Amino acid sequence: MAGGYKYFEAVEKNAGLLGILILIMVAMGGLAEITPLLIQAHAVKPAPGVKPYDALRLAGKDVYVREGCYLCHSQMIRALRAETQRYGAHSVASESVYDRPFQWGSKRTGPDLARIGGKYSDAWQRLHLLDPRAVMPESNMPAYRWLESAKLDGNDVAARMRTLRTLGDPYTDSDIDGAAKAVAGKTELDALVAYLQGLGK
């Protein structure tokens, strides 16, 4: 034991050697953290039926993120019996390949939304967003009444699609060119409802 301590003592007394050994250990730890991410990025393919968001749903996802919905709602069903019985099959990475930023979340004040699409009607979703306590008296969710009058900007949606295409999402020129027409006359409320209704489908 005393012999082993001499090596530690020698390293501790030599600041240059200690610094080099620290850099080596940090580099090894960094490789252990980063390498799987680089491999996984190429290995995770979209699940069957998973496509990039259309223009209206993409605008809705942006509203969802901007309004901080992810702070109270997750979109990740864990592989626990209680969760799969309540929400359905557990979430897998291939369902979220087009989510930037990802929406898995880390906290639930409200229910998980990964499979909410189609569970309620569009009218229910609209009312719930405008006046949550009208449909769920015990809800502590805030009302989002301003979304009903906020019009979407088709040029912003098209620019977002171009950016996502640069990041690897398979948007075509016709998708991008048609974005303005797809959201013409639509509100942020319409977009958020469309986004929610598509989750899990």
Task: Specify the residue positions occupied by each region the protein language model found.
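Short, solvent-exposed loop/turn and secondary-structure capping segments
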Residues: 30-38, 74-76, 81-86, 140-141
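Electrostatic cytochrome c docking/interface patches
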Residues: 41-65, 77-84, 109, 179-182
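The canonical Cys-X-X-Cys-His
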Residues: 60, 66-75, 125, 192-196
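Post-cleavage N-terminal segment of exported redox proteins
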Residues: 1-53, 167-172, 193-201
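Electron-transfer interface patches adjacent to heme c in soluble/periplasmic c-type cytochromes
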Residues: 18-28, 85-189
